[in-house]
Design a protein with these regions (language model features):
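Long, contiguous hydrophobic alpha-helical segments, chiefly transmembrane helices and signal peptides
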Residues: 26, 41, 45-49, 64
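Short, flexible turn/loop "capping" segments at secondary-structure junctions
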Residues: 4, 37-42, 166
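Hydrophobic beta-strand segments of well-ordered beta-sheets in folded domains
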Residues: 7, 43-47, 172
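N-terminal secretion/transport leader regions
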Residues: 4-15
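Compositionally biased P/S/T/G-rich terminal and signal peptide-adjacent segments
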Residues: 15-41
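Long, folded non-catalytic interaction modules
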Residues: 48-63, 68, 72-276
Length: 276
C-alpha cells in the first residue's frame, strides 16, 4: 500500500465539446430582431432572382425551394410576388445606397414594429461583403395577426416565458456583388444564399472551424477548399429554427431550442456514418 487514502471524490461532468460547439455556433449565427427574438418565414416563401441569366436564376430558385420545402415551408408558384429578393449586380455599393435612398420603407417601416436600428442599416449600406442581406420582420400575434404599434389586439397565453407575439419575415433582400463573389461552385453559392434567406444570420458571425456553408468566403480567403453545399450543421440549424418556439419573450429560449435540435440531428448523423 502507498498510504494514499481517498475519502471522497466529486466528479462534475462537463458538457461534451460537441454541445459547446453547437451552442457557440447557434449564438454566433443567430441575429435577433429589434424585439430580441429570432425571426423566420411563417408558411410561404417566394424567391425571386434578378441580374442572373434566366437558367442560373431558375437553378438558384429551385435550390432555395428544395431547402425551404425540407424545413416545412411552402414555395410560391411561378409568377408569385417575390418576398425573398435576390439581386446580382457588379455595382452593389451604388445599388444599395440608391435603394435605401429611393425606397426607405422597404428597409424600415416605423409604424409596424419591424424597425431595426439605424446602425444596422448603416452597416448594411457600408458592407463590402460579396453578399449582404437585410431582413424586414413583422411583429404579429401568436396566431399570425399583424398589427401596428398602438393597435388593440387579442393576445393569448401570455406568461413569464411566452410573450403572445412573434416575429415573421415580411421581406428579405439579398444583394450579390458579382465582382466580389468571383468564381465559386454554383451549388455552394446558392446554398449560402438559401441559408441567409431562410434564417436571420448575423453578418459578423464567427463560424471558423465549423463545417458550414457560411464559411464559403472565409475558407476561400484562407486558401481552404469551401464546402460544396449546405452541411449537416447548416441543415440542423435551419431545422432547429423552424421547430423552435416562436412566441417567446427572448431569443435565448429559441437558441436553446435550436441547440437541442442540432444536438439530436448531428448525433443522428454520427450514428448514420457509423452504420455505413
Amino acid at each position: 500500500e502507498d498510504g494514499t487514502t481517498v475519502d471522497s471524490l466529486t466528479v462534475t461532468a462537463k458538457k461534451a465539446p460537441e454541445r459547446e460547439a453547437i451552442e457557440a455556433f447557434v449564438s454566433s449565427v443567430s441575429d435577433q430582431t429589434a424585439n430580441r427574438r429570432l425571426g423566420r418565414w411563417d408558411r410561404k416563401v417566394c424567391p425571386g432572382v434578378m441580374g442572373l441569366r434566366n437558367d442560373y436564376a431558375q437553378l438558384m430558385i429551385d435550390r432555395i425551394a428544395t431547402t425551404a420545402t425540407e424545413i416545412g415551408l411552402e414555395v410560391g408558384e411561378p409568377g408569385c410576388k417575390a418576398n425573398m429578393i435576390i439581386i446580382a449586380t457588379a455595382e452593389s455599393d451604388r445599388l444599395v445606397r440608391q435603394m435605401v435612398k429611393d425606397h426607405p420603407d422597404a428597409f424600415a417601416k416605423y409604424d409596424s414594429g419591424i424597425r431595426r436600428s439605424r446602425r444596422d442599416l448603416d452597416a448594411f449600406v457600408a458592407s463590402g461583403a460579396p453578399i449582404r442581406w437585410w431582413h424586414v420582420t413583422a411583429r404579429v400575434t401568436a396566431d399570425g395577426q399583424r398589427y401596428k404599434l398602438g393597435d388593440d389586439v387579442r393576445v393569448r397565453e401570455v406568461s413569464r416565458l411566452r410573450g403572445g407575439t412573434r416575429d415573421d419575415f415580411a421581406t428579405v433582400i439579398i444583394i450579390l456583388d458579382a465582382r466580389r463573389v468571383g468564381t465559386l461552385r454554383f451549388s455552394s453559392l446558392a446554398d449560402y444564399i438559401a441559408m441567409v434567406g431562410l434564417a436571420q444570420v448575423d453578418p459578423d458571425a464567427d463560424t471558423a472551424g465549423v463545417n458550414s456553408v457560411l464559411n464559403l468566403f472565409g475558407d476561400r480567403a484562407a486558401g481552404v477548399e469551401p464546402v460544396e453545399a449546405m452541411t449537416a450543421w447548416d441543415k440542423a440549424y435551419l431545422k432547429g429554427l423552424y421547430e423552435a418556439r416562436r412566441d417567446v419573450r427572448r431569443g435565448a429560449a429559441q437558441e436553446g431550442d435550436i441547440a437541442r435540435t442540432m444536438g439530436e440531428e448531428l448525433a443522428g448523423e454520427g450514428e448514420k456514418k457509423k452504420g455505413e
